[in-house]
Amino acid sequence: MKFLASLRSLCSALFHSEHIDDEMDEEMRLHIQNRADDLERSGLSREEAERRARIEFGGVERFKEEVRETAWVTHLDSLFRDFQYAIRNLRKDRRFVAAAIFALALGIGAATVVFSVFYNLLFNAVAAKEAGRLVVPVRQDLDKAGDMGWDAGALYCRLSDLDSIRQQNHVFEDIVGYDGGVVQLRDSAGTYQLNVAPVTADAFEFYGVSPLLGRGITPEDGKPEAAPVFVMSYKTWKGEFNADPQILGKSYTIDGEPRTLVGVMPARFQAYGRLRDIWVPIPWTSGTTRSDQESSLALLARLKPGVSVESASAELDVIVKRLAAAHPDDYPKRFRARVLSANEYLMGPSGYGAVFHSDIQLKNILYDLLAAVLMLLLIACSNVANLLLARATVREKEMAVRAVLGASRGRLVRQLLMESSVLAVTACLAGCAMAWFGMKGVETIVHQKAWANIGAETVFGLNAPVLLFSLTATALTTLLCGLVPALRAGRVDLQPQLVGNGKGTSAGLRHGKFRAGLVVAQVALSIVLLVGAGLMMRSLYQLTHVDMGFNPKNILVVAFAPPRGHSGLPDRAKMASQEGQALIQKDVERLKELPGVAAVAVNNTIPGYGPNHGPQVTVPGGTRVEEAGLSECDENCVNTLGMRMIAGRWLSTGDVRTDQYVAVVNQRLARDMFGDGNPLGRQIQVKAFTQFRSRGSRWAGKKPPDPPQDAVFQIVGVVADVKNSGPQQPAVPMAFIAPLATGAFILQVRTNVEPASMIHAVQEQIWAVDRDEIFWILDPLEDFLEQHTYAVPEFGVALSGPLAGVALLLVMVGVFSVMAYTVSLQTQEFGIRMALGAQRGDVLGIVLRKGFALLVSGILVGVLASYGLTRFLASQIWGVSATDPWTFGGVVALVVITGLAACLLPARRAAGVDPLVALRYE
């Protein structure tokens, strides 16, 4: 009630101030009347009593003024009057207002966009309930090279082991499992190849996102007797089924099994595998040991409230090592298990936020961008501060008059800060509008196919934290822009302004060094931003022009999926069987006949992405042991992929068809095993194929049928190194053999036309061999490289480039404003010079030399600062030094050219001064 009363009082004071004055008059009259009554009772006449009462009470207006000064509402009223005066003043100088708001809006808008990207990717990337407690169990092979080793990443375990982890842990509120792959979905309209995520039946309740239509998968769906169901993604529902609202309840055949669609998820839901099309429940009964369920699942867990990541990691490590003792083939000899927060995992080397086998991580790029945008905000603030200083100099006579009339220094400072606040708030609104369009642009960029892996569940928008940042930026810009000009205006010298010409010329020259210093700071900061953006661009160029050892152009990749058991999980061992390999060979022969296809090869890897670890290789009778990548491929790989033979020959048709134990090695393996000697005709021994797993523990201890053990291969050829660990890593030792161990199930189809245009034809040719064959056609190999190798640095360039461009634009505005103002102050000087015989070129040179001096000072400071700061960028660039002279030289040249261009217009104006007019100029 007290609050409501105070609120009513405030509103009354603000909007009905005349009533407050009337009430005070009435109260004062009553006090005087009461005192007069007392005096009258003491024997004085009424007239004398009233006279003495008024004398004792004093001036009524004085008391009313004292009451007003003690009322806090008066301060609000004073601020409101300052606000009104600021609006009237700013309306008189619309060009200044437009320039200031434009500069600040650019800074605030750019800062808001980058902060939205930064916050939403780092802290709001997961759409699940209580996402802050989501963690991903991971495993690291301690015998591999750091976190970038092949076995680093998600922890995979058996279904039965997942049940054990659930029962034995005390740190997880819940833990679920999921897998990934491809299925064939059929209905009366056609056949679709879709990405599937088999999930434990409680996974949708765990994630906690409400479906757009219908329901999600429930624990009852995982019971063996439950009817087969599935849930569809928004993307698939809209793209493949035209957003049919009547789709629920329809039955589809998925890998030969009828399943009923029970739900469609919202657009943001991308759980359990980015870009999944459908989700199916994994049938599971605690304690079951059916062989087709002994595949492996990735895990996702939610910590109990109050449990730290460190304590959860310690307990998980103990449990998983206990499980590893029971299934030693599933795990490396030395490893550790731990948990990472879901956001940290997604942004790290194992998630979407890193270049394949690289130190370039989106998380670090985002921190660099945040620092860059704060520099941009400083440039905008110094720009506006320069404009405000110029304006304050012109208004010094006005400030002097107000000071003479009784305005305190604090009141003058407050008035100018109010003007800065009006500018900043208006710029904030304009900046938020710019940011809204900017974030639409970011979403458009991120949702391009090449960048589809970045922030699949992230929504970029003006949410509460982003708006809070924008308001904070507004408050800081008010202080940074307005405080120094306001304090300088508050120290105005009265006498020169009251007796002088009132134009502020002396003050302008007095403040010139400070304003020049602000321009130097702007130039220096822009140099830092441009150098950072330039290094990232140069790095991206180097990255995209690495010789990978093969030709990725016009290559379409087709990956065959293993058949699935009752659980919905893949039977990978069956893929390596003779029956499975024979079926793939029929597909190869069929595709070779397709018009537009130049060649077809089959192997077990995607070029550029493995294998980069595998079994141990040695020379029979020797002691040197080398871990080598092992690629099982056919006779067409070398020509189809454009690999270069160095010596000897490639695998022949006879080698592949008769499973000959011959091998082609790359230069790295030949050099490591035989030095400078000739490797042709020599032998290598593969110690054990059981060490060769496709990803983590995906084989889960199940070996392909009859793999050779300690097999000896004769080297028949040497091929140029292929970068199978990504473009940034040196080539790993590799051997190429016939499909003997895991089988070859990935096709590389080289086309004579655009690969994407062949997708439908390739699909139909494979289905002509076997309509039930399950496969997925990946993007053309160039696009695949784009997504997994170039997307993260491209994202950094896409954001840092515009920031650097805006910084350069603001510097041009800053240099132009300072030089234009300097020219206006020196109009008389230029007129006198020209009257004494100076030519237009002489005046032009004076102005350009002053501008060039500012630029050189800023460039020197900026280059020195860049040399110190770019070391923080060193881990995010590749193929170029952090102090690359070409980048620094290009940036300096760009700043000099644009800076002199900004000086040119004021210089030409100075050179065009009429001496007669200038000599009359005040």
Enumerate the language-model features and the residues they cover.
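Alpha-helical transmembrane segments of integral membrane proteins
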Residues: 66-98, 349-358, 388-414, 418, ...
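Glycine/proline-centered hinge or cleavage motifs at structural transition points of membrane proteins
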Residues: 383, 406, 412, 837-843
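Peri-transmembrane interface segments
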Residues: 338-375, 777-806
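A hydrophobic alpha-helix feature that marks transmembrane segments and, especially
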Residues: 371-400, 412, 475-489, 534, ...
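Structured, solvent-exposed hinge/loop segments at the ends of secondary-structure elements
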Residues: 37, 50-56, 60-66, 111-248, ...
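Negatively charged linear elements and acidic catalytic determinants
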Residues: 1-100, 302, 337-339, 345, ...
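Conserved positions within well-ordered secondary-structure segments
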Residues: 511-922
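Short, strongly hydrophobic transmembrane alpha-helices
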Residues: 95-121, 125, 380-381, 424-429, ...
